[in-house]
């Protein structure tokens, strides 16, 4: 199917966004849509009562001018959600013999896949503790510092930190997350940790190209039915909430990144309904961002299941790459063991024209060992078939890597 542009949807009368956390997968029933929840395998969905924001005016910012005479190629990889649920923290502790936390074995099979792109980016959906204290419990997360060490050791270069669990340990947790990532040579894109501090964009430089990443979430405080609120002491968080920032603001941020020299701009979006398909608001926001010419790839996460990819105006949208690593139980929430590691190759010719192509590696998380495994036609074949089918539902031309 030829790439296509979506028509911009009218402003929705209700925001089609899921405002829950990510539960780990206990056998208890899922919380009601009006109760606070978090990343466990039994999460609830809710529709906020507030109206969706107006996002008009994205076309008022001129599209970037092509850079001529400088052919270049770069491949960028992106994962689904990484979540250190309490159950996986306990398993990592046991694997380390009670001394520290051994997360690296969970990821070992995917190391060559993550290392292959020029740059690889993760979705870090939990704070990180510098002192390994106050760690993850149900509905509220905090990972040991070794989680970042393992993430870096498998080949990731940086992570998005904008998600509904960003504030799970408050401002101190945000500060420690940035410190732990930096200590492990991982860049971070997401909200700043204090007023006046710009948490993004973050820049990567390779192959003569400068790549910017911006990250936004529907909520940073795991609010149910509320995409507008932030803690009184942290008003700056609204700059990383796409519902308050609006598409116009995101496009403005992307244009500012280009003004700082970015050749490519990636936008990570924590959005959508958990365990469901692409919704109307995701399509609306996609249209508004992609028609601007400022955004080169939208990397979506949060639903914890793989959603289709699309190509809009020649640029990729991966609506949700599923889970890369979590403690969620697929027997309770089907599809949460499946993921896709996407790799997009960007090629610029001498005339300054860009071309994109994508491959994706289906992944499967073993439900007993919690190890992340490759999925292929001969290994974890059911998961492979589901992921390949889902990725192609919107006519995306991406190809499975195995």
For each of these PLM feature ranges, what is it?
Residues 23-58:
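Short, low-complexity, disordered segments immediately C-terminal to signal peptides
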